[in-house]
Swiss-Prot record:
HAMAP family named among the record's database cross-references: PSII_PsbY
Keyword field contains Transmembrane helix: yes
Record's subunit section: PSII is composed of 1 copy each of membrane proteins PsbA, PsbB, PsbC, PsbD, PsbE, PsbF, PsbH, PsbI, PsbJ, PsbK, PsbL, PsbM, PsbT, PsbX, PsbY, PsbZ, Psb30/Ycf12, at least 3 peripheral proteins of the oxygen-evolving complex and a large number of cofactors. It forms dimeric complexes.
Top-level lineage group: Eukaryota
Any single GO BP term: photosynthesis
Keyword tags: Chloroplast, Membrane, Photosynthesis, Photosystem II, Plastid, Thylakoid, Transmembrane, Transmembrane helix
Topology in the lipid bilayer: Single-pass membrane protein
One Pfam family in the UniProt entry: PsbY
Source organism (scientific name): Phaeodactylum tricornutum (strain CCAP 1055/1)
Annotated family: Belongs to the PsbY family.
Protein name: Photosystem II reaction center protein Y
Stromal side: 24-36
Amino acid sequence: MDTRLIVIAAPVLVAASWALFNIGRLAIQQIQRLKR
């Protein structure tokens, strides 16, 4: 495994997982709001 690839991939993966986490949390809030 090339270390440069890890250095490039790590922040991209962190950013992608953070974005998905935020989208998922917002989606859950919207669903809970619709249920009430």
